[in-house]
Amino acid sequence: LGMDPTAIGRVNATMDSVLMGHLYAKAAIDVACWDATGKSYGVRICDLLGGAVRERVPSYHGVLIASPEGSAADAARHQEEGFPRIQLKVGGRSVEEDIAAIRAVAAVLRPGVRLAADANRAWTTSAAIQVSQACRDIPMVLEQPCASYRENASLVGKVAHPIYLDESAVDLATVVAAIGEGVADGFGMKVSRVGGISAMRAVRDVCAAARRPHTVDDTWGGDLAAAASLH
């Protein structure tokens, strides 16, 4: 690009002017610009973003698809390691199996340890409603229960739990729409998917203004993506 990496806003505007989309590719450049800017001023990226609000960041553990007993054992083990949130993978099997796994995991969690049932788009709307209503006594959130934004929107008022969007939360515009339309109670955000730290900062501020919680992590990118998410 031949540009000053500390002019992060102009770098992003230039990329957007010559190439639509491709946010994963742009994210790498955006994160590199933030890194270069922080180093040039001798400060951390989090300080550029307004200052660190904590020195230790709570995380969550993902429990993969397994038997109810296996899922419960995994959740209990990582609860003892100090994880304050357990994300249980569901979907891709019968509704009855998902319900059994959710109940088994919920039974071993201590008060204060939060539970998310993450279908990663695997449920139909019917399955999401069945599982939620069958587990309405269990405090948890439903993360990306169905594949499309429209399907998840149709669940509002029919499920007994808050809905978090993950794969459908592809950019700031979708986050704004989901909040305004009452579709999402929270979000699972990926730094690389939305285009980098600059876009994630905007999502953070919108969620803060609307009092919507969100996670910040990434599926790919290794230590670099993890470091960007941490800041």
Model-predicted regions and their roles:
Residues 229-231:
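Oxidoreductase and adenylate-handling cofactor-binding alpha/beta cores
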Residues 43-44, 54-59, 81-84, 111-112, ...:
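Short coil/turn connectors at secondary-structure junctions
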Residues 53, 57-59, 65-77, 94-109:
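Active-site loop-helix segments enriched in His/Asp/Glu that coordinate
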Residues 16, 40-65:
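N-terminal small/glycine-rich loop or linker at the start of catalytic domains
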Residues 23, 55-70, 90-91, 120-124, ...:
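Active-site mouth loops of central-metabolism enzymes
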Residues 77-89:
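Catalytic domains of carbohydrate-active enzymes, especially glycoside hydrolases
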Residues 1-40:
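Metal- or metallocofactor-binding catalytic centers and their adjacent structured scaffolds
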Residues 88, 93-227:
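Catalytic core of soluble alpha/beta enzymes
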